[in-house]
Amino acid sequence: MIRKIPSFIEVYKSLIQIPTISSNNKLLDQSNKNFIDLLSNYFSDLNFSVKNYQIPHTDKYNMLACVGSGNGGLLLSGHSDTVDFDEKKWTKDPFKLTETNNKFYGLGAVDMKGFFALILEVISSINIKKINKPIYILATANEETDMSGARNFIQSTIIKPDCIIIGEPTSLKLINAHKGHMSYSIKVIGDTGHSSNPDHGVNSIEIMHDVIRSLLILKKYFKEEYQHPNFSIPYPTMNLSSIHGGSAINRICPLCILNFEIRPIPGLTLTQIEIVIKEKLETIMKKWSHRIFIKKLFSSVPAYECPHNSGTIKIVEKLCQLNSAAVNYCTEAPFLQRIAPTLILGPGSIEQAHQPDEYLEHYFIQPTKNIITKLINKFCY
């Protein structure tokens, strides 16, 4: 017999109050085990079979809950972690769900613990004994950093659902494509000396000037050679995000570091970009091979697209009366897409994600429940 879980509000509160911060700063990074354990208990109480998987060499976990058997079905997916927060900028307790002005406030309220609370609310109100195909619920770790949860999941899972829905905050707009993300750091090492005799040193800023010139040529190349009409910015973008070098006005600069990012469009692979970067920097790298060093800052995320001619898109568009679109931010979709056709559709606005006093507006609640119900009815009954 299915045991009743707490109300939507109580579930939502309990999920928000467990810190699950993911950060590249080890002092801020937290385990998500308590959150995963709680979520697992809720789904177990609803007669789901639940398995938790530890991400190797970490204290982070994925959860896969399943009810029903056979091939196909529906996978509803979200990430368990949140970003860090600046306590000085929050006017409310980040770990206490606060309901006011027709909004739910809290860290992860929209990105994306509210989605799990809504899934549980829907599941608790339907007769899962009558389903013909499985319902899967996936909660991943580390989406906000290296996406190791999703990367690990696709390497080990054997499930093949008919459709995957990632409940990221899209304002309930259907997303079928997004750009990828690559980040690099270039370090130029010079030889210092007194500025009164520039020839007795090697100025790293001057070498970096030539590096930047090559990167700007690459930036122009991306804009001219690659286009995707579904994006508001229809070409791969490059951003020279930060540069640091020098210590004193009368000293030849011995070290200069430039960080930059590239956001590729679908159809342009990570490998292709790496090859082009090497080609554009080849001449200057040969000239200064012992002085120029390039490395990745974070794990790259490929661009993603679920093709418009996919039967899954047509089904979901018709079911939800929505047209699919493309966005510029990244999700776990390019990884989950390797398992089954994947779409992004969830409550709340991406504009509220990663912001002080993060919130989910009330008016998304019932429409989201309706959409989840329709998806389950279509793919599982």
UniProtKB/Swiss-Prot annotation:
It comes from Buchnera aphidicola subsp. Acyrthosiphon pisum (strain APS) (Acyrthosiphon pisum symbiotic bacterium). It is found in: Cytoplasm. Pathway: Amino-acid biosynthesis; L-arginine biosynthesis; L-ornithine from N(2)-acetyl-L-ornithine (linear): step 1/1. Catalyzes the hydrolysis of the amide bond of N(2)-acetylated L-amino acids. Cleaves the acetyl group from N-acetyl-L-ornithine to form L-ornithine, an intermediate in L-arginine biosynthesis pathway, and a branchpoint in the synthesis of polyamines. Zn(2+) 2 binds at residues 111, 144, 354. This is Acetylornithine deacetylase. Its cofactor is Zn(2+); Co(2+); glutathione. Zn(2+) 1 binds at residues 79, 111, 168. Keywords: Amino-acid biosynthesis, Arginine biosynthesis, Cobalt, Cytoplasm, Hydrolase, Metal-binding, Zinc.
